[in-house]
Each structure stands twice: as C-alpha cells, then as structure tokens.
C-alpha cells in the first residue's frame, strides 16, 4: 500500500483545508489544536497528515518528507519553489501583502525625496523586490513576529506584512500605504512523488480541484 503524507500548518490553513480533504474522502482523526501529536492519522489507512510550521511546509514537500502540502503564496515566494509542483490555487486563507507605516508618517513624501527607509519584515525576498522595483532604497530588518511593534519601538519606518481585516494595524496606529499582492494558499506536490505515486496522488489532486471550482 502506497503511503501518502500531507504537510499542513495549524490554524486557518488547516481549518480551511478540511473541506478539501473531505472532498477527497480524507478525514483527520484528530485536531492539531487539541492534540499534541504532530503526525495525525486519517480515516484512510494509507494517508497521514504531518503538522509543521507554515514556513516549513515547502521544505517538507521539496525533500520528500511529505508528498503534498498546502502553503501560502507568501511562503512559496520566500522559499523559491525548487522541487515543487504547484498545480492549484486553493483560494483559501486569503489576505493581502502590504506596506504599512505609522499614522502621520508621510510615506509618499519620504519616497519622493529618496529617503533611505528602514523596513521590517519576515518576507525579505518579497520586500526587497518590491522596493527595488520602485527604486526605493531600504535597510531591510528581518523579524519573525510582532511586526507591528517595529515602527512603534523605533526599529523601522515601515513594515511589509500580511493584512486580513486591517484590525491589527489600526489597533497599533498603523496604516497600509501600498498593496503589494494578493495572497492565497496553494496545493504543492513533490515532483518525484507525483511520478512514483501518481496513481494514488492524482485522485486527491483532482478532488481538490473539483472542490475549489464549486
């Protein structure tokens, strides 16, 4: 029996992937929010789910530790996508990648005057490419969380981060000033697995595709 391993991260992506898994006849036996297990069995004896950090999903799939995974476009851009086949935009976990600054900071004027800006982000590749395309000189500061704190603490002039409702920005007196791109999560597949296990993997991929189209 061919074993299939699916890499998912906790939280919104896991929750929004459940209906897609169900469409493929796959139901995890436990919820990662309440279980301490990192390998979760499913109702299909040959399918298991591994729970990893969102940023690690592409790596697990790339190196074959997982055959399939679900990862945000933001994560895939930073990863680079080597060794991955990304056949399907799942249209889940949607948000925007944006530039935000403190209220009262004249971002347009700073850019117009050619000021060198300090920008904090965990999406350093995306941030670097965005500002380079605009001809804006920046000092990039890589952070791993609490991005909104950076301008408040004087660490950065601006941040590049994911924005869903804008509530967190507003609560920290920040405003979005540029929309970089829309973000949603994609199905990613290990290229070698697709060749070796196509008979088992393709029906899962097809079921996901049909569920997304509905």
UniProtKB/Swiss-Prot annotation:
Pfam families named among the record's database cross-references: HisG
Keywords in alphabetical order: Amino-acid biosynthesis, ATP-binding, Cytoplasm, Glycosyltransferase, Histidine biosynthesis, Nucleotide-binding, Transferase
A GO MF label: ATP binding
Enzyme Commission number: 2.4.2.17
S-S bonds: none
Localization of this protein: Cytoplasm
CDD domains: PBP2_HisGs (cd13595)
Family: Belongs to the ATP phosphoribosyltransferase family. Short subfamily.
Subunit comment: Heteromultimer composed of HisG and HisZ subunits.
Domain notes: Lacks the C-terminal regulatory region which is replaced by HisZ.
Protein known as: ATP phosphoribosyltransferase
Species of the source: Dechloromonas aromatica (strain RCB)
GN (gene name): hisG
């Amino acid at each position: 029996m061919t074993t299939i391993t699916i890499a998912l991260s906790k939280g919104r992506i896991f929750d929004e992937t459940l209906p897609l898994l169900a469409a493929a006849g796959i139901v995890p036996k436990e919820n990662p929010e309440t279980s301490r297990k990192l390998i979760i069995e499913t109702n299909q004896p040959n399918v298991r789910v591994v729970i990893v950090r969102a940023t690690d999903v592409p790596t697990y799939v790339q190196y074959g530790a997982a055959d399939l995974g679900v990862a945000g476009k933001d994560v895939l851009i930073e990863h680079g996508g080597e060794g991955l086949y990304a056949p399907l935009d799942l249209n889940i976990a949607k948000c925007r990648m944006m530039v935000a600054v403190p209220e009262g900071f004249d971002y347009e004027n700073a850019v117009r005057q050619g000021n060198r800006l300090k920008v904090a982000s965990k999406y350093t590749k995306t941030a670097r490419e965005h500002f380079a395309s605009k001809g804006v000189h920046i000092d990039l500061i890589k952070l791993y969380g609490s991005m909104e704190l950076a301008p408040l603490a004087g660490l950065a002039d601006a941040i590049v981060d994911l924005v869903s409702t804008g509530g967190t920005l507003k609560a920290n007196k920040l405003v979005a000033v540029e929309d970089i791109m829309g973000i949603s999560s994609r199905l990613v597949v290990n290229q070698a697995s697709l060749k070796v296990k196509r008979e088992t993997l393709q029906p899962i991929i097809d079921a996901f595709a049909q569920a997304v189209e509905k």
